[in-house]
């Protein structure tokens, strides 16, 4: 049976249309995973928060992930060998990922900067008395030489058959 989500009795054509309609971020004991787990867990949390207020960001993130998937599939099919047509397609994917990485990472950095005052104001609810909490966003994408770093990683990408640099690695 197909999952159906409705608002005021009207079903959405796509479930993604519901995201952001009820802007809510839930805090649970699992949030400690944000500290203990990998950067992927933290990225997903940030992405989920931003998606609550920016449909544009969510749409861009989905496009980025689709292009990333296509690039990774191409890298796998190339089996470490670069030829003319594959090189041209890889260039196209690279240009799109470089541009989108910069945009996505900047929105994430802006979110973290906007979230820090809320975190500071509510620190007492989050941590024990002798502890403090802080938050920073570190991204290779926001570095001045990101485009060069991305392009220089192509040899490694061909060997590993996946994209090793971009906003999906923040």
What annotation goes with each model-predicted range?
Residues 35-37, 55-58, 66, 165-169:
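Short C-terminal domain-edge/linker segments immediately following a structured domain
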């Amino acid at each position: 049976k197909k999952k159906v989500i409705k608002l005021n009795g009207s079903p959405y054509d796509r479930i993604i249309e519901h995201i952001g309609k009820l802007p809510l971020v839930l805090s649970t004991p699992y949030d400690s995973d944000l500290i203990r787990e990998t950067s992927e867990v933290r990225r997903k949390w940030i992405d989920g928060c931003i998606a609550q207020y920016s449909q544009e960001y969510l749409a861009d993130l989905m496009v980025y992930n689709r292009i990333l998937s296509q690039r990774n599939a191409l890298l796998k099919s190339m089996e470490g060998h670069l030829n003319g047509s594959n090189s041209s397609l890889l260039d196209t994917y690279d240009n799109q990922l470089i541009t989108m990485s910069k945009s996505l990472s900047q929105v994430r950095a802006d979110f973290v900067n906007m979230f820090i005052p809320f975190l500071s104001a509510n620190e007492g609810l989050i941590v024990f008395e002798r502890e403090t909490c802080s938050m920073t966003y570190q991204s290779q994408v926001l570095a001045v030489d990101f485009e060069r770093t991305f392009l220089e990683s192509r040899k490694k990408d061909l060997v590993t058959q996946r994209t090793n640099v971009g906003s999906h690695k923040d």
